Regions:
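Class I S-adenosyl-L-methionine
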Residues: 2-140
Length: 140
């Protein structure tokens, strides 16, 4: 259950692509699109979006350990700027993604389930419980 930055970045990119399409077409998501949207995890572990990606030479500023994220990050930014309703909206979306790096948190549903199962196996009466997945529709 290791955190794979590239997979998360790709899943987030697909979810954002769906959102941009839905916004343009002014319609609700299909079941298939909802499934893609459920895979969105935020950018809390993806500081790569803070790096420069405007031209291919920018990769030299990236740490070696994250250079495999250069191309998908570049594609994400290009997609947002080409698919958003207008340039101001695209800039707002990209800045929002960058700003969320330090404040976006995601708890995998497997972790929520493990905590829930562990609590259920005790005889403790729980009156209040912090739900680590607010917004993910996963509850303890």
């Amino acid at each position: 259950m290791a955190y794979n930055k590239k997979e998360v970045l790709q899943a987030n990119t697909e979810a954002i692509r769906v959102v941009l399409r839905l916004e343009k077409e002014r319609r609700a998501a299909t079941e298939t699109e909802k499934s893609i949207l459920r895979n969105y995890q935020g950018f809390g572990g993806l500081k790569c979006v803070l790096n420069r990606t405007d031209n291919p030479d920018d990769i030299r500023y990236w740490s070696k350990s994250e250079q495999n994220l250069f191309e998908p990050t570049q594609q994400l930014k290009q997609m947002i700027y080409s698919e958003a309703l207008d340039a101001n909206t695209a800039k707002r979306y990209w800045e929002s993604i960058k700003a969320s790096v330090l404040t976006s948190f995601y708890t995998d549903t497997r972790i929520v389930s493990a905590i829930s199962d562990a609590l259920a196996s005790t005889n403790l009466q729980i009156r209040r419980c912090l739900v680590p997945s607010i917004g993910m529709d996963a509850h303890i």
